[in-house]
C-alpha cells in the first residue's frame, strides 16, 4: 500500500501490516488563524475518532488519503 504522508503529503510505501491510509484534521491553539492541523499516514487499523478531530478519513486504496 502507498499513502500520502504528512507533513509533505508525498506518496510513500507503508510498512508491512499497515494497509490503511488515513487523514486526520484537528484544531490546535492556532486553528482560528491557521486552520486545522492535517495529519496523513499509514496505520494497521483506523485511528479512533476523538472529539478534538474535525474529520477523520480511513481508506484502503493507494494514495486515497488526499
Swiss-Prot record:
Similarity comment: family membership:
Belongs to the three-finger toxin family. Long-chain subfamily. Kappa-neurotoxin sub-subfamily.
Q: Which InterPro entries match?
A: Snake_3FTx, Snake_toxin-like_sf, Snake_toxin_con_site, Toxin_cobra-type
Q: Give the CC-aspect GO terms.
A: extracellular region
Official protein name in the record: Kappa-flavitoxin
Q: Which UniProt keywords apply?
A: Acetylcholine receptor inhibiting toxin, Disulfide bond, Ion channel impairing toxin, Neurotoxin, Postsynaptic neurotoxin, Secreted, Toxin
Per the annotation, which location comes first and is thus the protein's main one? Answer: secreted
Q: Where in the cell is it found?
A: Secreted
Question: Where are the disulfide bridges?
Answer: 3-21, 14-42, 27-31, 46-58, 59-64
Give the protein's biological function. Postsynaptic neurotoxin that binds and inhibits neuronal nicotinic acetylcholine receptors (nAChR) with high affinity (IC(50)<100 nM). Is a selective, and slowly reversible antagonist of alpha-3/CHRNA3-containing and some alpha-4/CHRNA4-containing AChRs.
Q: Write down the species.
A: Bungarus flaviceps flaviceps (Red-headed krait)
What quaternary arrangement does the UniProt entry report? Homo- and heterodimer; non-covalently linked.
Query: Which tissue types show expression of this protein?
Result: Expressed by the venom gland.
**UniProt-recorded Gene Ontology molecular function terms:** acetylcholine receptor inhibitor activity; ion channel regulator activity; toxin activity
Amino acid at each position: 500500500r502507498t499513502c500520502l504522508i504528512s507533513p509533505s503529503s508525498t506518496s510513500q510505501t507503508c510498512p508491512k501490516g499497515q494497509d490503511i491510509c488515513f487523514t486526520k484534521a484537528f484544531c490546535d491553539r492556532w486553528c482560528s488563524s491557521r486552520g486545522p492541523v492535517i495529519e496523513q499516514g499509514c496505520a494497521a487499523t483506523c485511528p479512533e475518532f476523538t472529539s478534538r478531530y474535525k474529520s477523520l478519513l480511513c481508506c484502503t486504496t493507494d494514495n486515497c488519503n488526499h
